[in-house]
Regions:
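Exposed beta-strand/loop interface patches that mediate assembly or binding
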Residues: 6-12
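Alpha/beta enzyme core
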Residues: 2-5, 16, 22, 28-35, ...
Length: 243
């Protein structure tokens, strides 16, 4: 009978390495990977992150070293996180063009035209309290924070980012950022939504690297509960609809 054993034998497509490779549904190569880079003020800085062995913070003038090593290995995409020269309650340094991420974007865009550059958009690295938004009466003001995030995203686009990646988990961030970029002539700049970002203890080492640990409280009011699968899917679909 056609379609049944013994005429149909699925193992025919598994017998030889060449055919197995040709029929792979999922192929992961260095070109599929994104390298995070933590950028700091100053010069000649190569500072190890103690909680993440092998990871360093770099000043802008030293970024060529990790970027060139990665590109030689086939990695072409880089996600930039910034540690600013100063912090305040509203994270006002986040959209300044003289800060590490914006400077790094300009340098890398000019020096490595084949690289794809993404700027992380959040306020936690830039606020003195370490939270992802502007605090009013003890809570994050979602809509006020959106205005700051849109300004940060625009500053990254102006500095040369191919895409921006809002990691704050505020409601409506993708829509507001998309509108800001499109209205400013950057419709080709992508928005990489973190979508399903959970309130997880696994972020501990990253917060050390980005110097973004909250000074009080936690981020459970905006990051997803780890128990809620359907909520994560809903958030991801909403981000997709927002652009």
């Amino acid at each position: 009978m056609t379609g049944s054993f013994p005429q149909s034998r699925c193992r025919r497509n598994r017998l030889y390495p060449t055919i197995r490779q040709a029929l792979m549904e999922t192929v992961i190569t260095p070109s599929n990977l994104v390298l995070p880079l933590f950028v700091v003020p100053g010069e000649s800085v190569e500072e190890p992150v103690s909680s993440m062995p092998g990871v360093q913070r770099w000043s802008v003038d030293r970024l060529g070293k990790p970027v060139e090593e990665a590109m030689e290995a086939g990695v072409r995409c880089f996600l930039l996180f910034g540690i600013p020269s100063y912090k305040d309650p509203d994270g006002t340094s986040a959209d300044r063009l003289d800060q590490p991420v914006q400077r790094a974007l300009r340098l890398l865009r000019d020096r490595y035209p084949e690289a794809y550059l993404v700027g992380d958009v959040c306020l936690c690295e830039y606020t003195s309290h370490g939270h992802c938004g502007i605090i009013k009466e003890g809570n994050i003001d979602n809509d006020l924070t959106l205005k700051r995030l849109a300004s940060v995203a625009l500053s990254h686009a102006e500095a040369g980012a191919h895409a921006v990646a809002p990691s704050d988990m505020m409601d409506g961030r993708v829509s507001v950022i998309r509108q800001e970029l499109d209205g400013s002539g950057f419709s080709d700049v992508g928005v990489w939504s973190y979508a399903a970002k959970f309130a997880s203890a696994f972020y501990g080492p990253f917060r050390d690297a980005a110097e973004s640990t909250p000074a009080f409280g936690d981020r459970r009011s905006h990051q997803l509960p780890v128990e809620n699968r359907l909520e994560a899917i809903r958030d991801a679909l909403m981000d997709q609809d927002e652009g």
